[in-house]
């Protein structure tokens, strides 16, 4: 019999711009920040009884190699008896970490888990494969920041290897999402995020990152990707990235960013035993596959699968956190799900276009934000969903306690 699973605490670092304030911080150190904060915020917990640390991370080609979850928990000061594992479903890695924790606890295999995600896109290295022969000269240097590398020729022949902005333009073409609508969606995200930041909403979920340097310490305590003063006119002037007849621009797409997130999940027994406060209940998670060329539409079948499983409808949710990989896919997804473009439930404090998209952390960030927003608004249920590179979608639902 499945057991109820609760989210008891959740924090994140600020989200840094590419090459910004967090670029000097290693991914394993960055991942340790929110994990350590959870430990310090909950001193009554016997952390030697933590069953697992699940962290999502998408790239894993640099300092985030060798199981960054395990390294992060050790760097955070947890006992070496606590195990950790890194999950990779690209953009949804952090959401998968939360979902994996949920399933472990629901099945009775775990009682107390930390889940979350991390990505340092600024520090993603250039890599090169080994030569096929001695002194070979055909090697190619690959940028691991985002997108395809070491492409399988069969994959390319069968499915194509469209870059992420190309997949967004494919969705815009297939679902008739105009440039004007995309720019309006992006402006809404920036304005809402700007208002939320000015009101101090994000301060409730952020733990500062302290960076030590030759001239002393620098404290990073606020998201730095936002452009709340942008306008429709400014967005309209940006050139499409895939050619003049296309619609996706740097202004209506998410950023390339750095950040990390961690949440405590527990069974009812662990909540009582460790003196935790149950803030939200995880209702379930679902995933689905779509054609890689239109990966951005992936949330639609994932949400439908989850809602059918839970016997709920979109109307039953008070907060909908949709990862804004691109405005084109965000609008296509909401329209396919019967959600109005101006529905106030969707990303009420802005989304990834404004806040940024540190790949492995973003899915966990959606869950964290949904829990905070439900508490702030008094809503009951939150729906979190996101598209995934190579053609997938993931959705996860929570309910305020």
UniProtKB/Swiss-Prot annotation:
Active site: residue positions: 91 (acyl-thioester intermediate), 357 (proton acceptor), 387 (proton acceptor)
The keyword Acyltransferase belongs to this UniProt entry's keyword annotation: yes
Disulfide bond annotation, renumbered to this chain: none
EC number in record: 2.3.1.174
Enzyme class, first EC level, given as a word: transferase
Function field: Catalyzes thiolytic cleavage of beta-ketoadipyl-CoA to succinyl-CoA and acetyl-CoA.
Subunit structure: Homotetramer.
NCBIfam families: AcCoA-C-Actrans, pcaF, PRK09050.1
Protein name, UniProt field: Beta-ketoadipyl-CoA thiolase
Annotated source species: Pseudomonas knackmussii (strain DSM 6978 / CCUG 54928 / LMG 23759 / B13)
